[in-house]
């Protein structure tokens, strides 16, 4: 099984959203259709980055890191 960590960028407010899912294609569709409460008001969105994991613990650990202050800075540097 694959686990995805992804980053969306809002063209409305120029901010990023960090999320995780087991089905990236379906999750992205939900975001773009406005079916996700956290990003509904920030449409239009664009997928700007994603990572694929096979280890669930590493997946969760990396999400927590990217959502921290240092992690967001690291992610912005990567992008």
Q: Where is each model-derived feature located?
A:
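GIY-YIG nuclease catalytic motif and its immediate N-terminal context
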Residues: 1-36, 43, 50-67, 72, ...
């Amino acid at each position: 099984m694959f686990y995805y960590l992804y980053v969306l960028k809002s063209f409305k407010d120029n901010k990023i959203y960090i999320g995780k899912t087991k089905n990236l294609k379906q999750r992205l569709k939900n975001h773009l259709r406005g079916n996700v409460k956290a990003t509904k008001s920030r449409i239009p969105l664009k997928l700007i980055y994603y990572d694929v994991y096979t280890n669930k613990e590493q997946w969760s650990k990396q999400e927590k890191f990217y959502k921290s202050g240092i992690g967001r800075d690291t992610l912005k540097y990567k992008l």
